[in-house]
């Protein structure tokens, strides 16, 4: 099984890039994990928010493979405590055969067709974060989940 984080647009803040890369590398000690970047849309001045979401949605769908289990990181998704998230991940590790794909959308969220393609939605907080920052929060939580499952010293209850 492989874990993939699919994001729209590259991370631009240098301090986020450094921290994200650190957690991605740490996480790879436990699982097969990668981050795929869908290029940001160009020339969006004349596009409505809905049009941008639709165009991003087309690119997201092209990046998905048959058999992928798709989980959206969405403000309306299910919330977990860190230990609950670790247990959820463990269940997925026993039931998903191919890729477990977590998707972070662009600044306006997801097109309806992406919601239709998803099997689940999870939320990392009731608060709103930039789509750049949530990448760091997610990879940290995935790493934390791996240390919980492997009895590592990182997480404290």
Swiss-Prot record:
Keywords: Cytoplasm, Methyltransferase, rRNA processing, S-adenosyl-L-methionine, Transferase. InterPro entries: Alpha/beta_knot_MTases, RlmH-like, tRNA_m1G_MTases_N. It comes from the Bacteria. Its main location: cytoplasm. SUPFAM superfamilies: alpha/beta knot (SSF75217). It catalyses: pseudouridine(1915) in 23S rRNA + S-adenosyl-L-methionine = N(3)-methylpseudouridine(1915) in 23S rRNA + S-adenosyl-L-homocysteine + H(+). It holds the Pfam family SPOUT_MTase. GO terms for cellular component: cytoplasm. S-adenosyl-L-methionine binds at residues 73, 105, 124-129. This is Ribosomal RNA large subunit methyltransferase H.
């Amino acid at each position: 099984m492989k874990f993939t984080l699919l994001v729209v647009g590259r991370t631009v803040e240098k301090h986020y890039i450094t921290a994200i890369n650190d957690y991605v590398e740490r996480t790879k000690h436990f699982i097969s994990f990668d981050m795929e970047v869908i290029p940001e849309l160009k020339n969006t001045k004349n596009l409505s928010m809905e049009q941008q979401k639709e165009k991003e949605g087309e690119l997201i769908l092209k990046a998905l493979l048959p058999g992928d289990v798709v989980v959206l990181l969405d403000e309306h998704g299910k919330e977990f405590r860190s230990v609950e998230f670790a247990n959820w991940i463990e269940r997925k590790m026993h039931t998903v055969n191919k890729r477990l794909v977590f998707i972070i959308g662009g600044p306006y969220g997801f097109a309806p067709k992406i919601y239709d393609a998803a099997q689940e939605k999870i939320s990392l907080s009731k608060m709103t974060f930039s789509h750049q920052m949530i990448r760091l929060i997610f990879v940290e939580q995935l790493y934390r989940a791996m240390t919980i499952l492997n009895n590592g010293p990182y997480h404290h209850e």
